[in-house]
Amino acid sequence: RRHTRFRNVTGVQTCALPICYGNNDYVNAGCGMGYDATLYLLEKGIRLTGTDAWSWDAPFYFTAQKWAKDHDPSIIWEGHKAGRDIGYCHLEKLHNLEALPGDGFTIACFPHKIRGASAGWTRAVAIFEE
């Protein structure tokens, strides 16, 4: 796993996408960022996060197992819920994170608004200075 921080953006490469994308197990891949981990980043000034995994949060398979044991509803979408305390945006299913260096570029995001939806896809572009 690799963590890249550039100004107020953090990318988390879990290797889920290049290894598992297109396979049935993709939704179970990735490390997942919990409430505390997400809040830690937000308290450091991060306002945009991204991952190559299916979700910012832990895969449903593991969340369901944990919920069946503890019946604690706070574990469901806990990384997402950190945004209630400190606002941020996150991107999921990012392709080609493994091709990016640790720094030296700017990220530009071009979201597609879907009427009535709370989320949509975006074109995330890395811009390198010459």
What are these regions (language model features)?
Residues R1-C15:
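Single conserved hydrophobic/aromatic residue that forms the stacking wall/gate
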Residues G11-E130:
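Active-/binding-site microenvironments in catalytic and ligand-binding cores
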